[in-house]
Every structure is written in C-alpha cells, then in structure tokens.
From Swiss-Prot:
Keyword flag Cytoplasm: yes
Residue ranges the record marks as coiled coil: none
Gene responsible for this protein: noc
Any Pfam family matching the protein: HTH_ParB
InterPro entries found in the cross-reference section: Chromosome_partition/occlusion (IPR050336), HTH_ParB/Spo0J (IPR041468), Nucleoid_occlusion_protein (IPR023705), ParB/RepB/Spo0J (IPR004437), ParB/Sulfiredoxin_dom (IPR003115), ParB/Sulfiredoxin_sf (IPR036086)
Source organism per UniProt: Lysinibacillus sphaericus (strain C3-41)
The protein's name in its UniProt record: Nucleoid occlusion protein
Length: 298
C-alpha cells in the first residue's frame, strides 16, 4: 500500500498542498485494513505529539460521546516492541477511552518509520484549531528539520502562506516565560508578536506580567510598548532642544506605571466624568494631581 504522506517524503508535486487528502488517507483507509483490539495498557502516546496541553473538558465531552455511540474511528498505532504500541493518530480518543476505564481499544496497526510517524502526528494536529501558536510553531520547526525543507517549501506543502509559517516560527525566539503564557492562553499570538519589539529580555518579561495582570488587549499593549521604546512628553515637544533641562532618566518600570495611570484616567474620561490633571516632573519624583468634580456641571 502506498505510504501516507508520500508527497511529503519526496514523491509527487512539491507545491501541491498535501494536508487534506493525505491526512484523510492516513485514517480513512481503515475500511481496507484489519481493526484489532489492543490492551490499553500496551498503548503509549506519540513522542512526536506537538500538543502539550489537552483540554480536560473536551476530553470529558468526547468520553461521553464514545460511551453513548462507541468509537466510530479506530486509533492508528505502530508496534514499537513486543508488548508496546505507539499512537500515530487518535490520542484524544485514546485519552477518552482511558478515562472510561476501557481495558481494550479498537486500533489499526501500521508499519511506519519514525519519520513517517512524526510527520503524520504533526500534520494531523496542524489541521486542528485547538493548537496554540507555540504548538503550531513547534510542529512547523519539526517538519522543517525532519524533511530538510525551506520555509517556502513547507508552506507550499501545507497549503499556507510563507508569512504565516515565518510568523509562527518567530515566536520560538521568545523567552520560555512568554511561550508558556501563549501555551496557557494567557496572551494571544498577536500579544506575543508585539512583545518581540522589546529586545531587553527583563523588560520584555516585565511588560508581559503587566499585560497579564491588567488584561491588556493588543492595542493597549502596543501603546505601552510604543511609550516605553519612544517616550515623548508634551513638555519635551514644546521646548527647544537647547533649552531642555537635564533630568534623571526615568526607569522603564516607572514609565509602565505612568502609562497605566494615564490609561486609567482616559477610561474615566470616556465614562463621561470630567477629570482635570496636572503633571509635574522634578529631579526626585514625577507627580500627577487628579481633580474630579463632586458635582456634575449643568
């Protein structure tokens, strides 16, 4: 039988997207193959699985579906030793059946290499919307390494734009703390891409924490980053360069605090309350005086 993902392994057109038909082939051809029952304790997850976090609620939902309707599609495995099988496709089904405490599961056994197993696992998961941007980026990186492809060639074979692949891969340059925030869905991919502009890692992590704590949207984060990287005050704009008084440099964490205060005042103003502010920048401190009328003017 023709190997699944043969075009990814060098045969066929290198520009034709392979994801849809060959992934379907990888699981759908089970009608022509033998489905056997395997002891669930002999099955292990795929070591090439790009997904690092499984949604317990969705696994529970899948468990209820399987309990009611049974397993419509068997999992696909390969034999790795006398009493061990590695999952090629269907880990969510495996986890759901394990949750139901099944002792045996329906499976199709395939004879595949590490390279083929990894590719099927990676591409199967790339079809699913549940992957985080980091998991997707890791999958792209592994496929590039496995098949020694350029980003352009990988994008063509997956039917995606090269910029999509490049933008995802760029996320892997971020510190582990930022990547973990994406994996845990504390920030979005767009948040992470905005953070790339900050080259100073301690500052980058500080802004990350501020983003999570204040629940900033992408636009708010971009405004904060702009203010940090290119701080310009009204006073500085109106005073000629020669007349600028010498001030102590404002630390980056103070800038973040000031921007947060100003952002809060803007929100108060938008709610319909008139707010008067006075700002004073001295050698020792930065003072903001806020005046809120007790009575609304008629």
């Amino acid at each position: 039988m023709k190997s699944p993902f043969s075009r990814f392994f060098g045969g066929g057109s290198k520009t034709e997207p392979i994801v849809k038909n060959e992934v379907e082939q990888a699981e759908a051809v089970h009608t022509a193959e033998e489905v056997i029952k395997l002891p669930i304790d002999q099955i292990v997850p795929n070591r090439f699985q790009p997904r690092t976090i499984f949604d317990d609620e969705k696994i529970e939902e899948l468990s209820r579906t399987i309990h009611t309707h049974g397993v419509i599609q068997p999992i696909v495995v390969r034999k790795t030793s006398e009493n061990q099988y590695e999952i090629i496709a269907g880990e969510r089904r495996y986890r759901a059946m394990k949750k139901l405490q099944w002792t045996e599961v329906p499976a199709i056994v395939r004879n595949l290499t590490d390279k083929e197993t990894a590719s099927i696992a990676l591409i199967e998961n790339l079809q699913r919307e549940e992957l985080t941007a980091i998991e997707e980026a890791v999958a792209y990186q592994k496929l590039l390494e496995l098949h020694e492809l350029t980003q352009e060639a990988l994008a063509q074979r997956l039917g995606k734009g090269q910029s999509t692949v490049a933008n995802k891969l760029r996320l892997l340059r971020l510190p582990d703390e930022v990547q973990q925030a994406i994996l845990q869905r504390k920030i979005s991919e767009r948040h992470a891409r905005a953070l790339i502009a900050i080259k100073d890692q301690p500052l980058q992590l500080e802004v990350l924490q501020q983003t999570v704590d204040n629940d900033w949207n992408v636009r708010q984060l971009e405004e904060q980053i702009q203010a940090i990287l290119h701080p310009v005050t009204d006073e500085q704009e109106s005073v000629p360069k020669k007349a600028k008084p010498k001030r102590k440099a404002i630390s980056k964490d103070v800038r973040i605090a000031l921007n947060t205060i100003k952002q809060s005042l803007t929100m108060v103003t938008k709610s319909g309350i008139t707010v008067k502010t006075e700002e004073e920048d001295t050698e020792e401190y930065y003072q903001i005086t806020v005046k809120i009328p007790k009575k609304k003017k008629v």
